[in-house]
């Protein structure tokens, strides 16, 4: 399992974004100096300037969508440069996906990479939630007073796309992992489980797995803090076992 981030992009006016800085040689230099001398400016901030959790339906007890907002935009993360116009990306993620991927061993030779199939947006529930998430984002950006002075224009997927089938397909074209893969060595006692409740691998001795892969299900949020907690719990269990 993994969290998939949908990446709608909005062009704006009357607003400076990281796109402007990236395409200005002078501003890149001054931005670098500002960071090295004062530890301030865009380089002192992470990739997301704003994070928030919301509910796709007010009947839900807890939020099921997460925003990561970046004052920059690009076509594909890590493959293309920032756009040459001011824009921002209100990335939104379904925190409870139902799509399941697979990891299959291809050979006894450890030098042969496994076959990894992520299967993003492979269920009707995830496709429906992707459409709902995009429409919620669109409503916030296009209809709220806070954004009005910036005259937002939906560059991607495009304000004209309202059909759910087309919207889910377009949203998936530019989606990316948010780097939360879990559950490949999940804890449990069924035939698909890899470790027991002590994090010891089934049918093996002296082998524990201590990372996000042991989670039976993905968490409704970032996975780093829960993984640290898993490690701390595992450390306690290892110490306790060493005494016996």
Q: Which residue ranges define each predicted feature?
A:
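C-terminal structured subdomain/cap of oxidoreductase catalytic cores
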Residues: 1-14, 88-146, 169-244
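Short, glycine/acidic-rich hinge or "gate" loops at secondary-structure transitions
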Residues: 148-159
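Mobile, glycine/GP-rich and aromatic-enriched active-site lid/loop segments adjacent to catalytic centers
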Residues: 68, 133, 148-150
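Mid-to-C-terminal "cap/lid" subdomains and adjacent gly/pro-rich loops that border
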Residues: 1-84, 139-146, 161-165, 169-173, ...
């Amino acid at each position: 399992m993994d969290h998939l981030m949908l990446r709608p992009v909005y062009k704006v006016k009357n607003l400076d974004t990281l796109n402007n800085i990236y395409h200005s040689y002078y501003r890149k230099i001054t931005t670098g100096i500002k960071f090295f001398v004062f530890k301030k400016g865009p380089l002192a901030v992470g990739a997301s300037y704003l994070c928030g959790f919301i509910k796709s339906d007010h009947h839900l007890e807890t939020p099921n969508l997460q925003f990561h907002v970046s004052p920059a935009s690009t076509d594909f993360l890590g493959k293309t440069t920032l756009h040459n116009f001011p824009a921002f990306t209100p990335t939104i993620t379904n925190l409870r996906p139902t799509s399941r991927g697979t990891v299959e061993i291809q050979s006894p030779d450890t030098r042969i990479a496994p076959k990894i199939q992520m299967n993003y947006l492979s269920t009707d529930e995830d496709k429906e939630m992707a459409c709902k998430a995009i429409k919620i984002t669109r409503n916030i950006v296009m209809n709220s007073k806070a954004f009005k002075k910036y005259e937002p224009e939906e560059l991607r997927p495009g304000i004209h796309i309202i059909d759910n089938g087309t919207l889910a397909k377009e949203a998936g074209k530019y989606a990316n992992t948010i780097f939360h893969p879990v559950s490949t060595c999940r804890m449990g006692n069924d035939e698909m489980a890899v470790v027991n409740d002590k994090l010891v691998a089934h049918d093996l001795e002296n082998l524990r797995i201590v990372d996000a892969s042991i989670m039976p299900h993905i968490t409704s949020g970032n996975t780093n803090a829960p993984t640290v907690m898993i490690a701390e719990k595992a450390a306690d269990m290892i110490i306790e076992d060493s005494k016996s």
